[in-house]
Structures are given as C-alpha cells and as structure tokens.
C-alpha cells in the first residue's frame, strides 16, 4: 500500500493508491472540491476507495451526488454529530 500524507493537487503525482482519505477544503468552493474528487478517482487503483469526511451543512448532499456521478456509487460509512463519512469505490470492469 502506498501512503500519501498531505497534498493539495494531483497534477504532480504519477502514482495510484488503494485508499485516499480527505476532509476537503469546503471554503475553497465546490469547483475545487469536486475537482479533487475527480483527481482522486483518476489516482485510485481498481477497487480503491475514497473516504470523505464532511458536515451535512457544508455540502454533504452535493458531495454524495457528485461522488455517485464520478464513481457510480457512494455509501455513508458512518455519521455522527452532523458529520458524514462517505465511501466511494473505484470499480473498473
């Protein structure tokens, strides 16, 4: 398993990962956050998972919709005190 601890963009990364975990920078705006999700999809191995921690009031519904659009799936892995952890898996047939 490759590990990536901190980064802001995927442009300079040539690797693929099994898991990417993020608490996205919501204040940067939806365009930035959604672009990150698209970059994560491109950099996940087949069967790789993206985990997103996000507050309901800061875009959880639109994140769920966007992840379903990009990955074709999105599940609530956990939720507590207004926070959601979404899991999307890259399934390549």
Question: Predicted regions span which residues?
Answer:
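S-adenosylmethionine
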Residues: 1-93
């Amino acid at each position: 398993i490759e590990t990536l601890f901190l980064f802001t963009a995927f442009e300079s990364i040539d690797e693929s990962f099994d898991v990417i975990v993020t608490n996205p920078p919501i204040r940067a705006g939806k365009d930035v956050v959604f672009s990150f999700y698209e970059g994560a999809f491109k950099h996940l191995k087949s069967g790789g998972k993206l985990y997103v921690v996000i507050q309901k009031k800061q875009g959880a519904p639109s994140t769920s919709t966007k992840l379903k659009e990009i990955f074709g799936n999105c599940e609530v892995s956990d939720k507590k005190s207004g926070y959601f952890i979404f899991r999307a898996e890259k399934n390549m047939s």
